[in-house]
């Protein structure tokens, strides 16, 4: 009998000309939490998709309890006791918790009787592992933390002995993260093993027993938690591409002048009692008021889907206001005025980059001038200056480390991280008055994240105001001067930098405080 529950040996995987996994080795022991750490694009999710049967390896072997395992699909993985909770849940909103958990399981002969048995089993699993759920609750009414418990119970219901969690804390409040970690410890105490995929150092050091680091599709380091240090893990993740000791990402220390006091001058952007509807004409933002001063970074925290996108679009004239007013430099922002704003010192990095910020069939050079194509030096107002456009594109490709054959390459051939770099290069191509950035570092590796942070802080020093919308509290705490917290379309509070605290913000993110009280406190 092998000492390992799982062994992955020499795993290779290519997508066309791109090598995603290069001779990767990984082991998991019974009853342990293995942290799988790496930056964006390191190969973490690809490796786990191979293990779960969603991808087929080009070479290599998988052994479960010392025996070769042929995993050609998720059904084979489940047969071998391997379950996976994806970063984006696969659920049916119109079903109850119980119906989602048993969905896909055979219910023969007497479905009602079997549902009663399933209910009992789900309740037993929930109690054993600290995964409190109401089996009869409609899924659509539940928070992301409870939805995640449903996905974990779905795997445990199918007798998973090895549970893969892909970036499980991304959409959780700090309190929900603590609850998840408690459940994971209960699981390993009862013999379940866990592979915990993350790019966050703090998490692996808090909950994992061993840590394996991937970089550029290779396994470069495995350490026991007791011997792991922040600097060793960061160095393994990025190699020599980042000065660890001087890094904003690593040290968490922001350098630069303190923010201006907003009350000393007219704020640049003001939102007054704004209400905005979503695409179904349902309320997305309600009675939202705040101001951003010149040279200030205001963060917007909240679990995804609480109105962040609608607010950003309303502020920039992309989406109509149901009521209220937005002003920029004292002038009202009106619907349809977006192009004028973008041509006059405003930049927007949207959440849905492929839908709202990028043309996959156009060249990299085209994408780098979107919204700026009628302005010098790209144009004389009538004709495009392609020599200047291509020369400028080459400069931006180098400055922002966009991995592409050149300015004429088609955008569809870029990776997600490189598409994000194109959006960032376009945003910072000119002096800015206002930046509205929604998850600006998504899909980027650590050196690129560091580069973005430095760019934002450098522009802040010149007077640029920033609305930074992010689900990453570490990012918000590092960069922001003040922090607004959004819950179900309402601003629950606005905190000064001296009062940033993960648990206070987490409480606001879960709606624990009344909107009126917190808003007044935030502005006071």
Annotate each language-model stretch with its function.
Residues 2-524:
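Glycine-rich phosphate-binding loops of nucleotide-dependent enzymes
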């Amino acid at each position: 009998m092998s000492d390992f529950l799982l062994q992955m040996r020499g795993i290779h995987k290519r997508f066309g000309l791109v090598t995603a996994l290069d001779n990767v080795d990984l082991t998991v022991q019974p009853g342990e939490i293995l942290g799988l750490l790496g930056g964006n694009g390191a190969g973490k999710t690809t490796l786990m998709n191979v293990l779960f049967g969603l991808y087929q390896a080009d070479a290599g072997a998988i052994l479960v309890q010392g025996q070769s395992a042929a995993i050609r699909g998720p059904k084979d993985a489940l047969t071998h006791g391997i379950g996976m909770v994806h970063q984006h849940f696969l659920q049916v909103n119109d079903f109850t918790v119980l119906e989602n958990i048993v969905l896909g399981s055979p219910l023969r002969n007497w479905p009602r009787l079997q549902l009663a048995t399933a209910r009992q089993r789900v309740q037993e699993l929930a109690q054993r592992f600290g995964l409190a759920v109401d089996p009869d609750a409609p899924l659509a009414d539940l928070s992301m933390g409870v939805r995640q418990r449903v996905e974990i119970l779905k795997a445990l219901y199918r007798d998973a002995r090895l549970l893969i969690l892909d970036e499980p804390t991304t959409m959780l409040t700090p309190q929900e993260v603590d609850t998840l970690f408690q459940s994971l410890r209960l699981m390993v105490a009862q013999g379940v093993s866990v592979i915990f995929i993350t790019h966050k150092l703090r998490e692996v050091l808090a909950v994992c027993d061993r840590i394996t680091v991937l970089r550029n599709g290779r396994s470069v380091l495995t350490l026991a938690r007791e011997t792991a240090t922040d600097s060793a893990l960061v160095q393994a993740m990025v190699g020599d591409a980042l000065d660890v000791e001087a890094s904003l990402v690593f040290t968490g220390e922001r350098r630069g002048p303190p923010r201006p006091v907003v009350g000393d001058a007219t704020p640049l952007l003001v939102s007054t009692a704004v209400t905005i509807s979503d695409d179904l004409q349902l309320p997305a933002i309600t009675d939202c008021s705040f101001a951003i001063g010149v040279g200030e970074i205001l963060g917007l925290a909240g679990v995804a889907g609480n109105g962040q996108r609608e607010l950003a679009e309303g502020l920039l004239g992309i989406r109509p206001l149901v009521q209220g007013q937005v002003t920029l430099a004292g002038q009202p922002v009106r619907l349809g005025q977006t192009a004028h704003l973008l041509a006059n010192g405003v930049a927007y990095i949207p959440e849905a980059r492929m839908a709202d910020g990028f043309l996959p069939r156009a060249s990299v050079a085209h994408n780098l001038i979107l919204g700026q194509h009628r302005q010098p030096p790209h144009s004389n107002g009538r004709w495009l200056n392609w020599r200047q456009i291509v020369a400028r594109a080459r400069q931006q490709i180098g400055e922002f480390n966009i991995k592409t054959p050149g300015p004429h390459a088609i955008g569809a051939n870029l990776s997600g991280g490189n598409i994000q770099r194109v959006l960032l290069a376009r945003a910072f191509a000119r002096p800015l008055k206002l930046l509205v950035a929604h998850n600006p570092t998504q899909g980027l590796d650590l050196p690129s994240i560091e580069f973005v942070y430095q760019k934002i802080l450098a522009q802040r020093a010149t007077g640029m105001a920033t609305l930074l919308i992010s689900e990453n509290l570490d990012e918000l705490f590092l960069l922001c001067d003040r922090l607004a917290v959004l819950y179900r379309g309402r601003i629950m509070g606005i905190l000064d930098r001296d009062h940033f605290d993960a648990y206070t913000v987490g409480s606001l993110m879960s709606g624990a405080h009344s909107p009126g009280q917190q808003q007044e406190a935030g502005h006071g």
